[in-house]
Amino acid sequence: MRKNRLFILATLIPCSLALSGCFLRNIIEPQQDDIVVDLPKIEVVNNLKINLQGRTTKSLYPVLSNNSVKNPEFSFTSSNNSVATVGSDGLVQGKAVGTTNISIVLKSNENVKTTVKVNVVDEVVNHYDYTIMFYMCASDLEYNSEKQESEQNHFFTQDIQEILSVHDIPDTVKILIETGGTLHWSMPSTSLEGASKISATNLQRWEVNNGTNKLRLVETLPYNQMASESSFSEFLSWGLDDYEADQMGVVMSGHGGGIAGCVYDDNYTTKVGNQLWQRTLRTFEVAGAAKTALANSNRDRFTWIGYDCCVMQVADIATINADYFDYMIASQENEIATGWNHDLYLPMIKNNTHVTPEVLLPEICDAFLLDNHREVETGEEICYQTQSVLDLSKADALVTSFNNLVNHLGVSAVAYNKAETAFKNSLNTFGDKIFGLCDFSSLLSKLQGVDPLLDVSEVKEAINDLVIYKNNCSKYSVEPCGVNAFFPKTLNSKYILQVGKEDYSNSLSTKFTKWQNMCVTYGRFGWDYI
């Protein structure tokens, strides 16, 4: 079975693995004159630009080139405080136009030092035609600690290399990447500028240098888990502050689990009872992060959000995202671990920097499905892959029509039992049936089957308006409609912690309030179903 981008909710990580790390070597002073000890190098951005008309503070987060010092501490000094000051935490504050040098010294060994040039300008902030921001939480898709190096797939390194393989992208297009979430990266140093490797112990922000087709390091940050609203909000603010464009796309890249959220960080776990769980970034946290970032920007919406993850094309998610994004692209089904084919759709932006989402996003769908069609043709494997595009301006109509339908169904134990029967009989269920997801149209048809008096036509029409493009190479007996419905199953459910009553009852989890009330009131959640 091929590896996919499905978020496994019940992943148990032994404490010994959670606490293990790299072997640390202390710097040992030579005992003889002829013994030479290679000092570590401080890796940090070589040049820092601060625009007084944009974000006037930026942080320096130096990293040692090896692990010779545990929890290294640095001192910072500005050569010209009238131009820019620097705090003990490395926060640089632009004051006036000019140039200053920031000296960075390792406190435990003053021979280890470097200098960063800071250029403070007062310029109109650059505006671009197109910016795509990749939030890459690589997890075990990049490095699996239980495998030998020869067995590693390095799927996220492959993703980045696909992006870099597209040459001659105009300077009016910016491709940004934040990296984190895994225990090790395998990106070759020859593809990087400003660092010898992608750090596994720090969050890092990069932009594609369109001239050299390399990743240029922009910022190195102290590690904060990627599956947090604050981390994601700061990422969005970075893009809005420094790379605002006519069109701005955001890509969530990592594992997905439907209503349970997306991206989980292998560097962070939460202990519940005797089990360790990776936390996810919930949909309401994605919305909260977008709200915060947009509030401090010159715009009120992003052009689109994409999920290069498993099973994220869910109606509940779409209704929440509709407040801050115009379009959404995702898969109803598990995605194969190789993810999107970036080298096949990016040329469309290269050739037309004003390409509309109605044209670009279907191209992403088709590029993703292309290799899967090839597998079907060669007979290697039956392909179960989907990808679809939603026009989120149509989401409110789906909310209204579905809430009206549930009103007719009734919020009661009897209604819940009807819904459960319909879900169990739905022809298309997704994510190995563990996430309570099924094709929305299929669920509606089955609901009408158990309650013939229900009229589902208005809801189906709303779905057809919402889904503006879909593609699949699946072998389902009925073609998926392009968006999933969520129903918390009562048996064999692994949502117990991640999406139990405490989570799905959250008023920010969905706009299908009638359906939500029925599921939370009459659904049976509990550990006994694992």
Model-derived features with residue positions:
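Extracytoplasmic/secreted cell-surface and envelope-processing proteins
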Residues: 141-156, 184-188, 258-263, 312-317, ...
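Bacterial N-terminal signal peptides
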Residues: 10-18
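Active-site groove signature of glycoside hydrolases
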Residues: 242-259
